[in-house]
């Protein structure tokens, strides 16, 4: 492996500045938990010359609750979010998905932002995020923008992030009354495997109709 430059900014502005400069010079990767990136580097799939570690950015590790509407920082580890009882009471399906990402040790590092940006069709958190109606806040050289989770991916390993952009946080809407969410996956083995099929639901009890489908990217299927 050739020499890799490691940058650890403390603010979003510092991260964006470093990203802008380094991306012009070569291949740059953002590091949150590193559970996917480090494996990709060791296997030779990814060969960055610069790594920007965003774990020291306070805003990206914050969790807030505004009258039932939650904002979760992109670098919040799954194990940390799992300890938020109020969030779990509102969005148990999201936590069900996070608890399926690797071992307890992996969950201590793996983040929502990393699982989303890895853009794997087998990513457990993504269907649950889509079903919840969550949006993602993105920041880059051109400013800030918000995007529905279902619009984030364009294919396996590919996202709608523009050059120099990073994911800042996830915004969850206030849960509707008489609603519930859940996540379930099918795997070849009993433990520690990636999903062959993952399904998330967010149901408001009104009508009794169901629609199903499978797609190479995550798909939202409203019912009537």
Language-model region placement:
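C-terminal structural segment of proteins
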Residues: 1-219, 224
């Amino acid at each position: 492996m050739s020499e890799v430059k490691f940058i650890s900014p403390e603010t979003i502005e510092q991260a964006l500045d470093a990203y802008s400069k380094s991306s012009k010079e070569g291949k740059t990767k953002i590091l949150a938990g590193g559970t996917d990136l480090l494996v990709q580097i060791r296997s030779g799939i990814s060969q960055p010359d610069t790594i920007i570690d965003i774990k020291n950015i306070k805003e990206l590790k914050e969790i807030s609750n505004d009258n039932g509407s939650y904002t979760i920082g992109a670098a919040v580890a799954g194990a940390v979010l799992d300890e938020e009882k109020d969030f779990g009471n509102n969005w148990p399906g999201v936590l069900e998905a996070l608890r399926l990402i690797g071992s307890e040790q992996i969950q201590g590092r793996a983040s929502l932002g990393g699982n989303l940006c890895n853009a794997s069709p087998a990513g457990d958190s993504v269907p649950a995020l889509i079903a919840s109606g969550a949006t993602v806040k993105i920041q880059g050289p051109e400013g800030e923008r918000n995007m529905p989770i279902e619009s984030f991916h364009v294919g396996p390993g590919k996202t709608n992030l523009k050059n120099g952009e990073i994911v800042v946080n996830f915004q969850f809407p206030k849960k509707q009354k008489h609603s519930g969410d859940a996540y379930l996956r099918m795997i070849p083995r009993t433990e520690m495997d990636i999903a062959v099929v993952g399904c998330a639901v967010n149901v408001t009890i009104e009508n009794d109709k169901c629609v199903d489908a499978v797609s190479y990217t995550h798909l939202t299927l409203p019912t009537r």
